[in-house]
Amino acid sequence: MATNAKPVYKRILLKLSGEALQGTEGFGIDASILDRMAQEIKELVELGIQVGVVIGGGNLFRGAGLAKAGMNRVVGDHMGMLATVMNGLAMRDALHRAYVNARLMSAIPLNGVCDSYSWAEAISLLRNNRVVILSAGTGNPFFTTDSAACLRGIEIEADVVLKATKVDGVFTADPAKDPTATMYEQLTYSEVLEKELKVMDLAAFTLARDHKLPIRVFNMNKPGALRRVVMGEKEGTLITE
């Protein structure tokens, strides 16, 4: 790769799943994975890319199981939102330890813990090359953190949502179950809907489609994949018009 290559994106929204933070433990936060992700985000900041981050909460709390056991869905979703704030606190701390300026914002007010989400403030911070971690989802029950990622991506006028997963991209079938599954390099929004490919939940996906926000699905466990994505190299699956 030529050393003078420039990033293809100026501002990104990175969506990390909570599960991505748990490592092999199956629960909680793996400190070594957290530190590696912080280093990869630091690389982007050093390239001059403005980074917004949305993190899920599935490594700390899963509401679906408790909902089946009779817990009120709204209560479960509120607990899930708090789990994303806990992940956000951990990520902010890891970034600070890597000497990266980061701010944590929450869609629900948590005075003394982090700032409340403000669109204008988030944009201002991004322009000053601060990493902005956007937690507590949309602040509403019944909306996933994928929906939050697309919503915040549209609000902060990100060039793309980068959805970090445990697989290399979007496949014709589940690669864990079907060895013949092949990966798509590029798809349109309508192709994803026609083929019923599981990229995100429908609410999140249609939000991105309606606002022409590109989505790139890639494997965060692959060292250097995030950098390759922002440099415009072949990595993962790109979904656009």
UniProtKB/Swiss-Prot annotation:
Region described as Involved in allosteric activation by GTP: spans on this chain: 23-28
CDD domains: AAK_UMPK-PyrH-Ec
Residues annotated to bind UMP: 57, 77, 138-145
Pfam family, one: AA_kinase
EC number: 2.7.4.22
Main location: cytoplasm
GO molecular function, one term: UMP kinase activity
Family: Belongs to the UMP kinase family.
Quaternary structure and partners: Homohexamer.
Name the UniProt record assigns to this protein: Uridylate kinase
Organism: Escherichia coli (strain K12)
Gene field: pyrH
